[in-house]
Amino acid sequence: MRLRNFYSALALSAAVFAGPLYAAAPAMAAGTISGGFDVGPGGFQGNFNPLAATGGFTWLVTYFEPLVIYDDKLENIVGDLAKSFEISPDQLTYTFKLAHAKWHDGEPFTSKDAKFTFDLARNGKTGSVFAARLASIASVETPDEKTVVIKLKEPSPSMLDTLTKVMMLPEHALASIPPEQLAKNAWWSSTPIGTGPFKFNKYVADQYVELTANPDYRGGRPQVDKLINRYFADPAAAIAALRSGEIQFTYVDSNDVSTFSSDSAFRVIEGDSFVVNYVGFNQEVPLWKDLKVRQAFMHAINRDAIIQSLYGGAAKPANCVYVADRLVPKAIDAYAYDPQKARQLLDEAGWDKINGSKPITILTYYNSPLVANVLAAMQAMLAQVGINIVPRTVDTPTYNSIVYKQGGTADEFPLIFAGLQNGPDPSSINIGLNEKQIPPAGSNIMRIRMPAVTKALDAALAETNPAKRDARYQDVCKATNANLPWGTMWVANRYGVASSKLENFIWTPAPAGGPYQAHPEKWAILE
């Protein structure tokens, strides 16, 4: 099929995927902002436990808070619940001076809460996704109620970046729950308390969460009385709700942007996603053991055509896990579209004996028409060289239950189409590739055990000289390009659309939703 006709057919299929599936709407009171804050890549995680969160921080940070946080441009890490912090010259001691803050039940936030949180986050029994990332912590000390001292076993230049995602938790509310029972405890969706500008009020399962203003917030009472997060099974339904005025914000795909950009009733927000989209090869599945098969996979996909035809040019090809110029050396393989070479590589690998035309499931949590069309394009291209993939789309909780399951069958997900944060700090990619991060320790869900990749990552993580750090991550780029633990596709821009009625509203297309300084206490809506 010619590409032009093929993509015309895909455009038609997008209309089919866009059928409305509406979430029940709560009554809108004056002074209420409602949004689809978890619409988009990753979607709703299925729980409100920040220790287990791999996304959804745009919403979580409205009522939970970390010690430190990125600014809204994702350029600098600044204090949040820590009013100040300093790092010792040997980079082994981090000292945080805490702000005067209260939990939503009126109890004071103290250093004991911070230590309690870090102890939970380092304990794999809690289901924490941070256990491996915080393994370099030797101790957490509390010399007084407003001081926290973290001591490391060895320098960890990525430590501050990790701490931006560790939301502080109340010791007095959670200490009685055994660590192994914490992950799925009802507390997270019924009576959670944080220190943020909004307080948890109620959750109507799979419909919406309602927060109310925290009158005692240290940054001042929020400008609106309520903040509501609506859940949508279909992104098209969120767009319809935005147009009708039921919500004032949602994520949109690049192919929806043009319908809003010329409408003064809305504001389009665009930015770098810092997320590399990739095809993951499950390394416990024999299909992908031969590098030539993985190379053939790359040469079979016309990434440039997909980027131009489906992403509207709003993406950049990724030939390794990074696209930032400073992290990508010139002498790497571009894996140019070459179906003839793909067939040759498959012949050399003996693909007909390995699998031939048998169907191979490619699992994804991306539920948008755009990604459905992307996978359809990949399916057609790969079929031309003799690889038969069959897309399977599930919601994020189901996806996580499959890929993180211990003792599961690798055949459940021989391939995935997913995304993982590769910035603002380049160390963030480590959790998906390093052998030490294989679940339950981390998020190396493809069970990658490639010594060259792990060695390059470890060297980059240990580099404390800023002048040498980029060169170390160039080595990571070289290792992932040569060994293909993933088939890296592209890094795309991301978009949000906000009603022009919103004032002081900050949304940044950050990986995993941030967190970053969004100042939700300053958000307002024109009546």
Swiss-Prot record:
Principal location class: periplasm
Keyword Chloroplast listed: no
Coiled coil: none
Matching InterPro entries: Peptide/Ni-bd, SBP_5, SBP_5_dom
Domain of life: Bacteria
Keywords of this entry: Peptide transport, Periplasm, Protein transport, Signal, Transport
GO BP term (any one): protein transport
A GO cellular-component term linked to this record: outer membrane-bounded periplasmic space
Cell compartments where the protein resides: Periplasm
A single GO molecular function term of this UniProt record: peptide transmembrane transporter activity
Keyword Zinc: no
Listed Pfam families: SBP_bac_5 (PF00496)
Role this protein plays: Probably part of an ABC transporter complex that could be involved in peptide import.
Quaternary organization: The complex is composed of two ATP-binding proteins (BAB2_0817 and BAB2_0818), two transmembrane proteins (BAB2_0815) and a solute-binding protein (BAB2_0812).
Name of the protein in its database record: Putative ABC transporter peptide-binding protein BAB2_0812
Taxonomic lineage of the native organism: Bacteria, Pseudomonadati, Pseudomonadota, Alphaproteobacteria, Hyphomicrobiales
